[in-house]
Design a protein with these regions (language model features):
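Helical hinge/lid and interdomain linker segments adjacent to catalytic or ligand-binding clefts
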Residues: 10-99
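Residue-level recognition of short, well-ordered coil/turn positions
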Residues: 38, 85, 114-115, 207-208, ...
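Short, solvent-exposed loop/turn segments at secondary-structure junctions
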Residues: 18-19, 67, 94-96, 178-181, ...
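Extracellular ligand-binding/catalytic regions of CAZymes and related secreted enzymes
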Residues: 2-9, 35, 189-198, 204-273
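Short aromatic-enriched loop/helix-cap "lid" or pocket-rim segments at secondary-structure transitions
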Residues: 24-26, 99-103, 186-187, 222-225
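Stable alpha-helical elements in mature extracytoplasmic
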Residues: 25, 29, 73, 117, ...
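A glycine-rich, often tryptophan-bearing local segment used as a flexible ligand/cofactor-contacting loop or short
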Residues: 68-152
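Catalytic beta-strand/loop cores that center a nucleophilic Ser/Cys/Thr
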Residues: 2, 34, 42, 55-56, ...
Length: 273
């Protein structure tokens, strides 16, 4: 029935921020969205501007890093999800970073801090990025092998940023990794051995957020504060077919409420006719 629905589905996509190849991520996600011709996507670089389009949106997709928003926008994002919509949040969406120079710290070195300056935003997402160890290969485990979002997906290894999170509320974890050790360069850099969410669902009243922490990417020109030409192009999990499987399934998941609504409206129209 879902494939027979011909009505338009509206997506708001926020792609912007720092230290990542946003152009690459934006294009890859738009290509997947375009596989369903019913999806019409409006693209924004920040949440405050995107908030103006949320009233007409059926679902929200985000790939950002260090993009903050006003309290009113945080409230609107939470209300959007709480009202029954879905938000697919990728990689650095939950990241707010502040670089502390040696004179700002007691440690005598450059450190990265994760300020708790957007509490409602992070509560809606269900997590906030705090740190990651140096990029290196790690194993992603399937927490719920029978979950439809990871049906047929087996544990895999990726070279990516292993996100260490502060969580909010109850998370339905679908993929996780195991880690304990140092996240060098971060203020909160000491972590005990434990499981860390990689792919999870967070319920917000009638709606849900799906979060996937994987997906770091960086090109030659994405670190202008530090260098005019970054020597390495980093694609991390984007090099893996399984990552595109998770992207596609997440986007299919995100549009389910819209399809259910359109189907119900069509049935009502048939009854009236």
């Amino acid at each position: 029935m879902a494939d027979e629905i011909k009505k338009r589905i509206n997506c708001v996509f926020v792609a912007g921020g720092a230290w990542h190849d946003i152009d690459f991520a934006r294009l890859e996600i738009l290509k997947i969205l375009s596989e369903d011709e019913r999806i019409r996507t409006r693209v924004f670089e920040d949440y405050d501007t995107a908030a103006t389009a949320l009233d007409e949106a059926d679902f929200l997709v985000t790939y950002t890093c260090n993009v903050t928003c006003s309290v009113s926008t945080q409230e609107k994002l939470q209300a959007f999800v709480a009202g029954g919509k879905r938000w697919y949040a990728l990689h650095g969406t939950n990241s707010i970073l502040r670089f502390l120079t040696p004179k700002d710290t007691q440690y005598g070195e450059l450190l990265i801090e994760a300020p708790r300056s957007q509490p409602l935003f992070m509560e809606t997402l269900g997590s906030q990025f705090i740190a990651h160890p140096p990029v290196a290969p790690f194993r992603v485990e399937v927490t719920q092998p029978n979950h439809p979002l990871v049906e047929g997906v087996e544990a895999f290894e990726t070279t990516d940023e292993l996100y260490l999170l502060e969580t909010h509320g109850v998370l339905d974890v679908i993929l996780h990794c195991d880690y304990g050790g140092d996240a060098k360069g971060f203020v909160e850099g000491k972590w005990e051995q434990q499981q860390h969410p990689v792919f999870y669902i967070h319920e917000v009243d009638k709606g849900q957020v799906l979060y996937l922490t994987l997906g770091h990417c960086r090109g030659h020109y994405d670190m202008p504060e530090f260098t005019d030409y970054y020597p390495t192009v980093e694609r991390c999990a984007w090099d893996l077919p399984v990552y595109y499987t998770l992207l596609r399934r997440g986007l299919e998941w995100a549009k389910i409420p819209a399809l259910e609504r359109i189907s119900a409206e069509a049935q009502e129209d048939e009854v009236k006719a």
